[in-house]
Amino acid sequence: MLFLKKEREDKKGSFIMNKMKKNELINVKGIIIGIILFLLFYCSSYLQLIPILLFNIKEITGSTQVLLSLFSNTILLIILAIIFRKELIHEWKIFKDKFLANFDIGIKYWIIGLIVMMVSNTILTFVLKMGQAANEQEVQKLISYLPWIMVINAGIIAPCIEEIVFRKCYKNAFPNKWLFIILSSLVFGSMHVITSMTSPMDLLFIIPYGSLGASFAMMYQKTNTIYTSILMHMIHNTILIILSIIA
C-alpha cells in the first residue's frame, strides 16, 4: 500500500512538474544555446572561405556561388545534427511511428499558412504596388545558374537547417506555446527579408514569410517532432524551385 501511494505521489509530482515546464515563459539555457546557434547560422557563410582558399578561387561566378552555398550549408547541417543528435533521434521515432497522423497535421497547417502567405503577397503586390520580395529575386537568380543543385541546397538542406535553428532552438528556449510560435515566426520572417531588403517597405514582406513560419511552428508544437515541419518545409521549397525551373 505504501509503495502504491508513493507511486501515485511520484506520478502526481511528475505531472505537476511537466505542467510547470509548459507554463514557463523562457528557458535560460535554451536561450543561450539558441543565441550561439543563431550566430553560427548567421556567420555560416564564412565557411565558404575554406574552399575559396583551398582551391584558390579567384572569381565568384553565379554557379560558384551556388556551390559555395551548398558547401557551407552542408557543413552547418552536420554541426547542427551532431549538437541535437539525441533529440533528433528521439523525434524521428515519434515521426516514424505516427507518420500518417503527423503528415496529415503538417499538410493542414501548411495549407493554412500557404493561403495566408498568398493573400498577403497579393495585397502587397496589387494593392500596395510592391514588387517581388528581394529574397525571392535572389533565390530565382541562383536557380537559373544551377537549378538542380538548388533543389538539393534550397529544397532539402536549407529547410533542415532553418527548422532546427528557427523551430527547435526556439521551442527549447520558449516552452510557452504562443511565445514560441510568435517569436520563431517573426524572426524567421525577418531573416528572409532583412538580409536582402532594398527599402524600408520591404519589411512588410515579413508578414507572408512569418505566416508560413507560424504554420511550421504550429505543426511542430502539435506533433512534437521537428520532422513534420522539416518535411513540409522541404515540400514547399521544392515545389517553388521546380515551378521556377519549368516556368
Predicted regions: what is each one?
Residues 2-4, 11-25:
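Short, Lys/Arg-rich, polar N-terminal cytosolic tail immediately upstream
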Residues 23-27, 31, 62-70, 98-107, ...:
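Hydrophobic, aromatic-rich alpha-helical transmembrane segments
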Residues 27-44, 109-116, 181-187:
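Alpha-helical transmembrane segments
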Residues 29-87, 135-137:
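Alpha-helical transmembrane segments in multi-pass membrane proteins
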Residues 46-57, 124-128, 193-197:
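Juxtamembrane "helix-exit" motif on the non-cytosolic side of transmembrane helices
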Residues 57-64, 89-158:
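Juxtamembrane helix-loop-helix connectors linking adjacent transmembrane helices
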Residues 81-91, 219-223:
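Structural signal for the C-terminal ends of transmembrane alpha-helices
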Residues 122, 126, 144-247:
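Transmembrane helix-loop-helix hairpins at the membrane interface
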